[in-house]
Amino acid sequence: GGTLAVLGDRLLDADPDYGREAGFFLYLGSRIGPAARNATAILPVAGPGEADGTFVNVEGRVQRFHQAMQPPGVARPAWMVLARLLREIDPGRAAVRDVRAAFAALASTTPEFTGLSWRGLGLKGAPLSAAAPAGSGAR
């Protein structure tokens, strides 16, 4: 099979054989559920409260969250791990050195985030762009 990458989902409801047919199964998470144990490679990422980042709430507003504690061991923010993986795949890719640059990269490549900036989110966040394609799941 092909490559399967799972980010952050503990796969608690997944079949115990989940991912076994993949040629390469990469799991990135802060907690490992039973199905994640089938992964070819596991990369630890910081969990909630262990990194700065953003989320989209149920009203479709993008909001920032801030690190409250240090992640355990060698876990790093998901944006950092993904940025390093992308640099390995494409060495010519520009380096992403902080969460603000990661958000800028997202906003420059994802229609739903067009026009948004880390600073512009402020304390109350901002709505996703009206440019979100129909059926994209963006609210």
Show which residues each predicted segment covers.
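Non-catalytic alpha/beta scaffold blocks inside enzyme catalytic domains
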Residues: 1-119
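Long, compositionally biased stretches
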Residues: 115-139
